[in-house]
Amino acid sequence: MKTLLLTLVVMTIVCLDLGYTLTCYMNPSGTMVCKEHETMCYQLIVWTFQYRVLYLKGCTSSCPGGNNRACCSTDLCNN
């Protein structure tokens, strides 16, 4: 009986996902876990002077305005 109760407690903690944090893609590659106040992922497209495209990605607390910017709020959504 104690084993069953312990199993239920552990499963409840796992399923509640306490302390959820957002995960975003970052530059130059890979992923990052955002800080608690960073609630969005962003992707910024920058054109260099040689007409090359540079993609900047990461976590942000607010979405910057303007063209060539995209923000989202789910895990790994800034691909």
Swiss-Prot record:
Pfam families: Toxin_cobra-type
InterPro entries (UniProt xref): Snake_3FTx, Snake_toxin-like_sf, Toxin_cobra-type
Keywords: Disulfide bond, Secreted, Signal, Toxin
GO terms for cellular component: extracellular region
Gene3D superfamilies (alphabetical): CD59
Localization in the cell: Secreted
Tissue specificity field: Expressed by the venom gland.
Keyword tRNA-binding: no
CDD domains cross-referenced by the UniProt entry: TFP_snake_toxin
Disulfide bonds: 24-41, 34-59, 63-71, 72-77
Signal peptide annotation: 1-23
Chloroplast is among the record's keywords: no
One GO MF term: toxin activity
Top-rank taxon, per record: Eukaryota
Record-stated family: Belongs to the three-finger toxin family. Short-chain subfamily.
Protein known as: Short neurotoxin 3
